[in-house]
């Protein structure tokens, strides 16, 4: 699967709040971090815990893709995230690094 297809698959799983399919897109030793900042999570199990909480606390959570660019194994998404009616809404850049058909790292800017 190419990098763009993988990122789309994880975005679709995120929007469906399908935790197993979402986590399956990530490498066992994946890293989530703030762009030019601290690492937020390391490893698939930490990712599972984080997003299980996110999905439980935000049942109407939805991300809309505003734009996407790719350069090799790097995919950058511009996303609009809505937590639900009357809840927090924000835009984010998600910079995905894909290795061996899995997401190895995501750096977020918001």
Language-model regions: role of each:
Residues 9, 21, 46-50:
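Alpha-helical elements of Rossmann-like donor-binding domains used by nucleotide-donor carbohydrate transfer enzymes
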Residues 2, 15, 33, 39-41, ...:
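A beta-strand edge to alpha-helix "cap/lid" segment located at domain peripheries
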Residues 1-17:
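Short, aromatic-enriched amphipathic alpha-helices that serve as compact interaction elements
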Residues 16-31:
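Short, well-ordered alpha-helical segments enriched in acidic and aromatic residues
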